[in-house]
Structure formats: structure tokens, C-alpha cells
Amino acid sequence: YIGSQYEKRRSAGWSDSRGGFGSSHSDYEGAVIAGNTFDFPAVHGESLMAAGYSFVSTSVKAVEQGVAKLEGYKVLDIIAGKQKETKVGYGAYPSKYKLLSSALIQAVENATKTGANVLLTGAYVASDVFDHQSPNAEEVAFAKNVMGYAWGGSQASCTGEVYTIPTAVKQIPGYTDIKYNNELNSKVYCVESPNSIFASDKLGMPFMRYTENNRNAGIVSRREGYRTAVLGFPFETIVSREVRDLLMKQILDFFASEK
């Protein structure tokens, strides 16, 4: 990637002095652009440890195959990043990278029945479930009934700025300004299209909004026997380490409280 495409007319011819169809800007030529560095459990783990918690990590595949058991843990931190269902070629092969598989849904739901609280963060946590011509009923039921969230729209922000708001959840007092990365750079991947989400029932409430338009960026929910928190952008893209630590501690304090 060297820059955004500016010539989209197929009829535009190419010459040495004039770029034709497919020509793009060169403002990123030679620049190092961060992608998936596969070390985000460590980024989340830093904030978990700063809040006084220990942690272990596992792959989704290990959970789906039953190798890693989720029962017995107090908190599940699901790192969704920018994962979403992606078509392969012209559709001759099955799509890949869907966020929620049936096996993962069952594993997380079983864990919540033993009291596990769940934190889910990612740019497509809602749109990958709801934004389909025929949404999968199992996925929708999991999002709404187990996690307590629903889709409020895509392309929720272009500034990368959110803020927490005062709610009935005393552990998250509000008035914290948060910046997540929305620009290509060499340190952490760019979030171009975060989700807006809202609580699916009266057990939950929004606690975070996108600064530019006040759309919901995150919800918390008191479920039956456990609690959840969902963000419409990836936690690991929050620019400030101090803010990541603060937000993680507030969410964990909410999980641990009885009110």
C-alpha cells in the first residue's frame, strides 16, 4: 500500500508522464504500516496486571476444539480486533474469519453459567453478527441474550475519539477522554470503521460515546449471575497506556462489584 487510489476510470490510459486506471497517491511509499502483530494478549495483559490480576491466554481454535476450557475463570477477555467474515474470491469457496462460531458461542455461554464475566472489544463485534441479509439466529441470540448488545451502525466515527459518560455504574464515573488509533502508522493497526452498539435490553446501558456524534461506543450489562462489557472498537488500539490501564481497571471493578 502506497496511498489511496485516485484514478478509477477504466478508460484512463497509462503513459510514463500520466498515470492511468488504478493510479494512487504515494504519500505512504516506503512507510512502515503496522498490521496484526499477534501480541495483543500481552497488551491486554499489561492492563490486567496493572489492575492486580493475573492472566492466561488461548487461541480461539483451542477453545473451539475443547482443548482450552473457559469454565472456572472469573473474567473472559475476547480480543476481536478487526476480525469479520470475509469472502474469498468470487464466492466459489466458503467465507473465512467469521467472528462467532457455534463452538465459541457455546463455550462462552457455558462459562457465563459458572459466573464468568465477559469483556468483548472489536471494530466489527456487532456488524459481523447483525449486518447481513439473513443474520444467523444463534449469533444474534448470543449477542442479545448472553452479551446484552445489539448493532447501532457501522462507520460510527472518523476521528478516533470517545469519552465515558456518568451512569449508574459507580465503578465507571465517566468524563474520561479516550483516543484510539484511526490513522496508518508503524505502531498499531488503524481502525477505519468502528461499530456503534447499544444495550439489547434493560439489563444494560451505554457508558461510552463517540465524541464527534455521541453515538454509543460501549455498553455494560448486569446479566443473570455475571456481567458483560462490549466496546465497538479494539481495546488494544487505545493510544495511551495509562488510559488503557484506567479503563481496564474500571471495567474489572464493575465485574467484581455486587452493585
Over which residues does each language-model region extend?
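Structural recognition of the beta-strand scaffold that forms the well-ordered cores
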Residues: 1-3, 56-57, 74-80, 84, ...
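A short acidic/glycine-rich loop-to-helix N-cap element
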Residues: 235-247
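Aromatic-Pro/Gly-enriched surface loop or interdomain linker
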Residues: 1-75, 79, 235, 249-259
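Solvent-exposed loop/turn segments at secondary-structure junctions
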Residues: 5-8, 62-64, 81-86, 118, ...
